Amino acid sequence: GFGFPLSVALALLGIAFGLHAGSAAAEPNFILILADDLGWTSLSKTMDMTKPGARSDFYQTPHLQGMADRGMVFSDAYAPAPVCTPSRNAMLHGMTPARMLNSTLNTDRSSKEYRGKITIPQALKLANPEYVAAHFGKWHIPAMKPSDAGYDFTEKEKGTGNGEGDYLDDMRTHLPGDDPKRLFSLTQMTKDFISEQANAEQPFFVQLSHYSVHIWHDSLKETREKYRALPRPLKAVDSDYLPDDEIPDFKHNWLLNYAAMIEDTDRAFGDLLDHIEALGIDDNTYVIFTSDNGGGLRGNAPLQGAKGDLTEGGIRIPLVVCGPGVLEGQYCSVPTAGWDWLPTFYQLAGGTAPLPKELDGVSIADTFTLGDKATVERPGDALIFHFPWYNGEPESSIRRGDFKLLKNLDTQAVALYKLSEDLSEKHDLKSSYPEMAASLEQQMMEYLDSVGAEDVNQLRAGFLKNIEGEWLTKAEARADSNRAAAAAGNAQAQQQLAEAEKYIKWLKQEAIFTRERMAMSEGNN
């Protein structure tokens, strides 16, 4: 198997914390499974019974489907951001990316200003110091290490990025074929941790952050062959059905590989669910399955957009919950976002001391037992998203009730949608509801101003500084170091020179593009 005793791993890392066993735990356990780039329509379980197409007609996720039948599906769940790092950081801290000054992929200010507020592990330990916390898999929060966030156990002290989901430790050799995206070894690690805590009667929180289904895509060959034999779906193209040996390894636009990877993720999840049941702790354990942002291969219909966008396809995500008292086989349409987990877990763990006032999240614990009948009191009754993407379309959005407003931060153009009638965001209603549009825009901008949210042109200035400074200098040095050998006919040097010159060309084009966007944005503000 892939497993190894957790005590060995901790000794190797040198982060054992002198934990002690408590009495039989009445406190609930929490298992948060975070998929990477998994879209709202990528499961075989329907995410919204009122919306046609809110499931996949090809991908098969029977274990998640079974869990949903025993628990609750949240049809209106949102990621904090449409890309990974700000989403994960916001979930961890219970705050919006806008407040954390980590709205895109840069974390410089966030690391300086928001370490030490409170995190999910720290909140649980505030509720009860007996809680033990572990994180396995993709970390991708450069601003802090897992131990800084209050995690007692992790497989890599500094945390991990995307590369560990594709390569062995040398970052050159791909993972073995029987452990694509580390799905099964990470699951075994998580099972080992859960067993140790259950045997010690210690309440625990574990977050298993899978590398799947982020690129590069990979799957078990046997699962791919299963999908090869299934009826061809609408999304398929002829090249999807080429023989394995005619398709490049880890190809990320290959439907059979993507479908198989989703089912392999579900298989690993099913193994974890079986383990919880075998230990007899399922009646005292909350299990949450969700995603860090939107995704989807070849579109997210009926949703508009995908990862990197504040349309529904970029931020609406699957969310399934089961555990003690959670209504079985129910759907809940109460809007929620990833920053709600910290106060939710804190309430369920019995926490009573006030949490930091900076939190944006609110507890949705009552929805577990009451569904749509629950009252979730949220300041402003709205979810606000800010994605000042310096390298693309910068946007902010707000959802309040059925209405959602999207604002382009370069052009200042706004669009208003009524999601209950137009989930695909095709019909701009701002001329029909001008007062609603004005109210939402004002509420959104007042919030962003109040938290000092990042400005897109300030981020672009920083991006330009990197492009025209350190990045370009290093690329030109790499090109110069290979020029003489390349001229002498050295094939390896020729390849490295070509790659460096291609990168230099891209950097210069990005600089031109960024300056053009800055000028256009300044002209509209």
Where are these regions (language model features)?
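Formylglycine-dependent sulfatase
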Residues: 21-409, 414, 423-442, 446, ...
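Acidic/polar, glycine-enriched structural segments that form the non-catalytic walls/loops
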Residues: 449
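Short, flexible loop/turn segments with low-complexity composition
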Residues: 357-358, 452-464
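Bacterial N-terminal signal peptides
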Residues: 7-18
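N-terminal secretory signal peptides that target proteins for export/translocation
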Residues: 1-4
